[in-house]
Amino acid sequence: MTHKNEARWTTVFNQYLREKKLYGFFELKHTVLEYLPFSKIEAVQYDGLQATAKSGLVWKLSDQDMREKPCDTLSIPPLPSYVVIKFIDGFYLIDITDIVKMREDGEIAISRSKAEQIAKKIIKVELKKKKDYEEE
């Protein structure tokens, strides 16, 4: 999947979050396969999502960013933390604790069918163009 397509799907997901007022911490992963290897989730992402679910987040917004910022620092309470997998048919919100348990049980990937069973939410999207789902 091209970076342009990844950026587009991230924009679509972020718009959904704004419209539906869905709150949490989200790490988006895109795949054109019927599964997502856990190796695509970096250690810092596993650690970060578990920490935000348990302790929340305090984050200093960068002064280097040229865009206007609403404030200097964010302090957010613990909220659900998800790995969001963009499969061909939609976004699957998988709680980080479920991903961690699967890894501890020896799993190396999550299939779309397994994601459908354990997802806290599934946001279906329409397939518009085949090129949206092709590998680079």
Which residues fall in each region the model found?
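Conserved catalytic cores of phosphodiester-cleaving nucleases, focusing on short active-site segments
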Residues: 19, 23-33
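Short connector loops at helix/strand junctions that flank enzyme active sites
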Residues: 23-25, 44, 76-78
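Charged phosphate-binding loop/patch that engages nucleotide di/tri-phosphates or the phosphate backbone
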Residues: 106-136
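Mg2+/Mn2+-dependent nuclease catalytic core
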Residues: 31-55
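Acidic-basic catalytic patches of nuclease active cores, encompassing PD-(D/E)XK
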Residues: 1-22, 134-136
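Active-site donor-binding loop signature of nucleotide-sugar glycosyltransferases
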Residues: 28-30, 96, 127-130
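Nucleic-acid nuclease catalytic cores
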Residues: 50-101
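Surface-exposed flexible segments
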Residues: 35, 40, 93-107
